[in-house]
Amino acid sequence: MSHATDSTLDNASVDSEKVRDFGDDLQNHPVQPTRSILSKIRSRDDDARSLVSNNKGVERIISDLQEGAGQLGPLEQPYDIKKIETHPDPHTDYNEADPWKYPIDSESGLRLVEWVDGDKHNPKNISKAKKWLYTLVLGAVCFVVALGSAIVTGDMERPAEYFGVSEEVIILASVTVFVIGFGVGPLVFAPMSEEVGRKPIYVVTLFIAVVFIVPCGAAKNIATLIVCRLIDGIAFSAPMTLIGGSLADIWEGPERGTAMAIFSAAPFLGPVCGPIFGGLLCDHAPTWRWIYWTFLIVAGVFYAIFIAIVPETHHGILLKKRAKKLRKETGDSRYRSFNELQIRSFGEVAKTSLLRPFVLLSELIVFLMTIYMAICYGLLYMFFFAYPVVYQQGKGWSASLTGVMFIPIGVGVIIATIAAPFFNKDYNRRAQVYRDRGELPPPELRLIPMMIACWFVPVGLFAFAWSSYTWVSWAGPCFSGLAAGFGFCCLYNPANNYIVDSYQHYAASALAAKTFVRSIWGACVPLFTIQMYHRLGDQWATSLMAFISLACCAIPYLFFFFGARVRTFSRYAYTPETNTK
């Protein structure tokens, strides 16, 4: 299940809390065409703080940054520099060492470093071939990470026997702590990437994740497995969190739909393929440790491919590096990127990334969408343990043959991925009516795919429930996964989009809250699934979850008809009149 698609997304946006208490070096100086008004400012990055205090020009830029936040889509909310109007001084001078010839901004007195037309270093200007290469590599990494959460479910008995622990404990050690890590990591890695870029986070966290697969496979006691799987889950959450932002960096909005659909499918296909590969290793590998050794090889190979191919794509970081280089080469301290005007203390970062997500859970839209997505995520992980109960314990099948039964879920995900561009086209058609009138499209337009897809999940669950008798053909519970897989994937992106459009500047925090709660619930479900099936029976255990998912079908309809009214009572929801509160 995607964390990236949240998680995505989940980078902190620019808001009014980011800019305050900046120092007092600058007053309202008139701009001199040949003499720097920033002569007291050294070229060190931490001196950028003194650029903005009491400078009305910079304050206006910051205001534009705030208004431009939230324009890049469901998985990341950076500022859109194209929406920021600068005013070059008509008497500006140019530095010979500056190949881009940045002028002095008449309001701020800065040489504002941004992308120029046709800038070959702009990630959005790279060739289509490279864009698709990066997209496929990023999607493959996301698939491998998601695979790691479920491949261990193919063989639970042998490690439990080796460590001398119960079924519940081995599930806790191999699945639960890993998924908990998925929820914790984004709270740290998303804001960190805004400061240092995406590539360093990818390189370090993936290296840690690959290294800690080794002690999992070599573990001599259950404590080692628990600790190392938790570290792996936290480290592997970084690419799940940041990949959506990387795709937003390279694709323009109208082009991004297909790339995002591929990325969104990868985190679903990974867990679905996990039991397939895990079951084969269970039946044919000499020891359960080969599950980890196989995953180590796959993860290591894709880590190397990723490092070799995908560059840094974060626009703010690339422009910050350019500004720093120009300051050094020209000796002119006025070269500043927009990122350098956004200065936050540690306390502000902590408040934004750690506290605000939980505050936003008090919002009805965030709360109900979080509950809905958490239930769907839990259902996916429920299947990993319900299928062995139905097929291995009920029908006496092998682990590898049971794993094959997950294929229809994957087919449903693929169908949903193919359908995604058509849903997106329908949204753009409906939204254009509002844009032609100079209005923002209402967020509720994002809910139409959810209103269609929500019914597929309970249908698939009821079909699984009442075709899972031992004397009924294997095909019933198997092909019920087709509807469930389609529903899971089709619900996910519209839910993210609706939250983003409803909260704009606070969308990153809202998505982080959803990711955290969803991960905690997804981690807990495997702990009681087997007991639930044994006590309620295969039919009523699945039916219970089907009834819950059926009740959740009311959520998209509720917000489609009443969402606008709900937002009027919100402290944080975005409106064109009030911007962000």
UniProtKB/Swiss-Prot annotation:
It is found in: Cell membrane. GO terms for biological process: hexose transmembrane transport; transmembrane transport. Residues 1-43 are annotated as: Disordered. Disruption phenotype: Leads to increased susceptibility to cycloheximide, 4-nitroquinoline-N-oxide, and 1,10-phenanthroline, but not to actinomycin D, fluconazole, ketoconazole and colchicine. Also leads to attenuated virulence in mice. GO terms for molecular function: transmembrane transporter activity. Glycans are attached at residues 11, 125. Pfam families: MFS_1. It is a multi-pass membrane protein. It comes from the Eukaryota. PANTHER family: MAJOR FACILITATOR SUPERFAMILY, MULTIDRUG TRANSPORTER, PUTATIVE (AFU_ORTHOLOGUE AFUA_5G02700)-RELATED. Belongs to the major facilitator superfamily. DHA1 family. Polyamines/proton antiporter (TC 2.A.1.2.16) subfamily. This is Major facilitator superfamily multidrug transporter NAG4. It comes from Candida albicans (strain SC5314 / ATCC MYA-2876).
